[in-house]
Amino acid sequence: VAPELYEGLINLQHRGQDSAGIVTFNGRFNVLRGSGFVREAFDETAIKKLSGGIGIAHTRYTTAGSAYGLENVQPFLVNSPYGIALVHNGNLTNYQDLKVELQDNDHFHCNSDSDTEALLGIFASELRKTPPSDHFFNILTTAVTGVFEKVHGAYSVVGVIANKGVFAFRDPHGIHPLVYGVRDKNGKKEY
């Protein structure tokens, strides 16, 4: 899936982009991040080494955090709960408050200046608090509802949960819309 993600990034890039990242999953997360335009950030050899049947990718135009250094480049990952990789587009207006809440309540350290890392921390915290269910979708929607209650601003989110699959959601007001594609491949739907 990495070559398709790479091609998608090339089609999404724009003049203000300063970095890009890709994560795939094959039983473990495989991450590649780089600075500059997509073709500058990655070489095709590195792309081919990203194994896995699912993945997400992101091109970054700096709106929060520094444009320098790879610590602010998405996707961001956490190992617990489940293992989550996440990217987002938008701006969180209460980002600084979220960082304090994560540190004080969850002992979660944000290692970057990116509001995406705080969003991931809140999502992981909400997933961790959600009671078990026979249907993972119920767990996911309960966690996203918790995100809506805490995270203010405009955002669209796409992520991967280890051994569960891809998920997506947007802010409850639809300020940053989200579009996904579906195709039929060998009689199965791919999103």
Predicted regions and their residues:
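Conserved short alpha-helical segments that host acidic/polar catalytic motifs at enzyme active sites
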Residues: 1-191
